[in-house]
């Protein structure tokens, strides 16, 4: 397996900027990246954190605590069905976000629109029980909420991954850390609430309201933080089209597009020695390097050429959205294919085994599943944050195969956790230890693939980095959907035989 490409490797990355060298604008973007990571997973984490409420949602929707359900198969597997509906919807919708017509939509509109849809998902789950309905209505509510969640996630997730893919890699690491923290936060609250409130009809209802209110509050805070991003100078330098009509990203004249960014015309600092080349400088360097190379890819698609000529004819620097529309999706996919595969297979294994198989072997235990999920989430977030430290990166570009190999090596967890699930290894302690290794490996590989994908050979401008980030998000959905389907099949066979 070779990770070599036909284009030159990207310029060496700048060392991470020290915290005391950050501007307030740069720090704010880190905070927003972290909040976006939390918001991506908060709805599904809030839903999964109240399993008793979801498994007996028909009782609360019908306002009848003694109702005997008719659709027992659906309610027994409601969490899996909900997740599957959400992921299949995302899998269908997210690739559509790469269409040229969708890429014309302003970045801020996409972010706020996707976030608003995620808020609606939780509101639907809370409003229906307040108004009351039938069991069939409760089933329909679950399906509709799952669809709404998948729609919102596909729009918001693809835009967030894409946008921060155009920033230095440390921002993607922080964003991925936020995704992991979301799970830790909800698991921690689940433990506290579970210990404080009884598992009665009213107690479970209060638990669900706490989780859902927390979710809506975090989403609302992220919504406001994203609106303020349009006035952030650091954000506009890296990705100008955040709502301001006049904000332009010059593809060739940015004074530093790496970890150290300064305003055009500002005096250079001693940190300048670490700064990566600007986008235009990278393009000029690549063009010079390949001018005599007959194998170098020079051709643009007809669509790309048309957009490029239109931008040049306008006589002004292209905006990020204009660069984005002029980007070939398939050429970017060729550049990130190995990180795409590593990321997708990693989530296939994770969602095949977690949470159903990895935590469902002791259904009579009140705490095993709760504690196991908490351990997994904590270790997952540690793995995700590890990509913020360069010591955990492959030392050279041609050593990226290590990430791919590590992703495929996680297949070893399949027999180890299946044997535990079938009680051939009947030990709760074994389950906790496995969650540590399983969580660390899942978080590390996911984060490294998402960070390294947009840093691949041939990814040398904002548009390509955005598309690369979006493709990595799609790889999560592809792997996750396949893993979820395999999980349903495995558990169905287990119940039958």
Curated annotation (Swiss-Prot):
Q: Which GO terms describe its cellular component?
A: plasma membrane
**Which GO terms of the molecular function aspect are on file?**
nucleoside transmembrane transporter activity
Q: Any ranges marked Cytoplasmic in the topology annotation, and which?
A: 1-26, 99-107, 157-172, 230-337, 383-400, 454-465
- The answer on whether this UniProt entry bears the keyword Membrane reads yes
Q: Which InterPro entries match?
A: ENT1/ENT2 (IPR034764), Eqnu_transpt (IPR002259), MFS_trans_sf (IPR036259)
User: Where does the source fall among the domains of life?
Assistant: Eukaryota
Topological domain (Extracellular) residues are: 48-77, 129-135, 194-208, 359-361, 422-432, 487-497
Per the entry, induction is: Slightly up-regulated by pufine starvation.
User: Any other comment in the entry?
Assistant: Can transport tubercidin, a toxic adenosine analog, but not formycin B, a toxic inosine analog.
Q: Which family does it belong to?
A: Belongs to the SLC29A/ENT transporter (TC 2.A.57) family.
- Recorded protein name is Nucleoside transporter 1
């Amino acid at each position: 397996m070779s990770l070599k490409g036909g284009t030159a490797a990207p310029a060496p990355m700048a060392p991470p900027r020290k915290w005391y060298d950050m501007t307030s604008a740069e720090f704010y973007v880190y905070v927003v990246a972290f909040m976006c990571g939390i918001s991506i997973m908060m709805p599904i984490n809030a839903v999964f954190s109240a399993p008793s409420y979801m498994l007996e949602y028909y009782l609360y929707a019908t306002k009848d605590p003694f109702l005997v359900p008719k659709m027992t198969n659906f309610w027994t597997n409601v969490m899996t069905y909900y997740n599957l509906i959400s992921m299949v919807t995302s899998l269908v919708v997210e690739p559509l976000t790469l269409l040229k017509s969708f890429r014309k939509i302003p970045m801020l509109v996409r972010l706020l629109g996707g976030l608003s849809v995620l808020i609606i998902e939780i509101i639907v789950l809370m409003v229906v029980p307040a108004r009351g309905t039938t069991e069939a209505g409760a089933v329909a509510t679950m399906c509709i909420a799952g669809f709404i969640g998948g729609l919102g996630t596909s729009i918001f997730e693809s835009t967030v991954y894409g946008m921060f893919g155009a920033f230095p890699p440390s921002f993607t690491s922080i964003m991925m850390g936020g995704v992991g923290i979301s799970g830790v936060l909800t698991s921690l609250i689940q433990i506290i609430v579970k210990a404080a409130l009884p598992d009665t009809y009213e107690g479970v209802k209060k638990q669900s309201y706490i989780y859902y209110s927390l979710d809506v509050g975090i989403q609302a805070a992220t919504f406001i933080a994203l609106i303020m991003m349009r006035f952030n100078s650091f954000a506009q330098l890296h990705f100008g089209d955040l709502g301001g009509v006049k904000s332009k990203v010059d593809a060739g004249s940015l004074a530093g597009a790496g970890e150290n960014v300064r305003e055009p015309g500002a005096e250079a600092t001693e940190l300048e020695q670490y700064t990566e080349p600007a986008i235009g400088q990278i393009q000029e360097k690549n063009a010079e390097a390949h001018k005599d190379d007959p194998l170098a890819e020079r051709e643009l698609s007809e669509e790309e050429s048309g957009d490029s000529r239109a931008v040049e004819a306008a006589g002004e620097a292209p905006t990020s959205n204009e660069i984005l529309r002029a980007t070939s999706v398939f050429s970017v996919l060729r550049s990130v294919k190995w990180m795409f595969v590593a990321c997708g297979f990693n989530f296939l294994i994770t969602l095949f085994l977690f949470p159903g198989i990895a935590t469902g072997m002791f259904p009579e235990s009140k705490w095993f599943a709760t504690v196991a999920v908490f351990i997994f989430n904590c270790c997952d977030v540690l793995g995700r944050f590890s990509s913020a430290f360069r010591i955990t990166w492959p030392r050279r570009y041609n050593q990226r195969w290590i990430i791919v190999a590590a992703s495929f090596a996680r297949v070893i967890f399949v027999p180890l956790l299946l044997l535990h699930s079938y009680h051939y290894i009947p030990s709760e302690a074994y389950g906790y230890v496995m969650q540590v290794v399983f969580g660390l490996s899942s978080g590390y590989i996911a984060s490294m693939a998402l960070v390294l994908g947009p840093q691949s050979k041939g990814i040398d401008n904002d548009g390509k980095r955005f598309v690369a980030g979006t493709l990595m998000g799609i790889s999560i959905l592809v792997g996750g959907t396949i893993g979820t389907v395999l999980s349903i099949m495995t558990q169905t066979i287990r119940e039958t035989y």
